[in-house]
């Protein structure tokens, strides 16, 4: 790993925060939502990447804005069913997510919608040993990068050049500490360092 990559990563990495849509599963076109397991298409290499993080002893937490709940497009129970099915798929690969935290609200109605800190605070309440200094935030949008930066967490942009990339991804590339084309490549960098 180059020194320029290594200098951005925490010395004692303990927790990896992951955005969901666009990192773990394929991102839907703007205005469309993952509403069921049938529309949750796992990105290549994701189960194996998460298994590698688990084997390295790292805590893996998903933090996700799920505005579609507030819009009435799906329910919190629908999201839970998706996450249970995803955990089963991960289990088949010797992997797991330690916790899922999601914001079910529309814009400006809460403190938990990324980039606000509420999802991080929920994670710390459940796992008191979490520290921003030993965490990494991996996401595919400017909101994910801003979330991490506001908290002082190292940020990694998954820049897959998807046709469904979030607006502002170019500026997120500039402000992220690091960027990689896939979760697998980001995990490679993390595990070489830790």
Regions found by a protein language model. Name each.
Residues 2-61:
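Active-site neighborhood of HAD-like aspartate-dependent phosphohydrolases
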Residues 177-186:
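Short acidic-hydrophobic, aromatic-tinged amphipathic segments that line or gate anion-handling sites
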Residues 86-91, 124-127:
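Conserved hydrophobic residues forming the short capping helix/wall of the S-adenosyl-L-methionine
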Residues 114-148:
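Conserved Lys-Pro-Asp/Glu-containing loop-to-beta segment of HAD-superfamily phosphomonoesterases
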Residues 34-41, 74-81, 114-115:
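Alpha-helix N-cap and loop-to-helix initiation/capping positions
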Residues 46, 50-83, 95-109, 148:
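Substrate-recognition element of Asp-dependent hydrolases with the DxDx(T/V) motif
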Residues 137-178:
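Acidic, Mg2+-coordinating phosphoryl-transfer loop and its flanking beta/alpha structural elements
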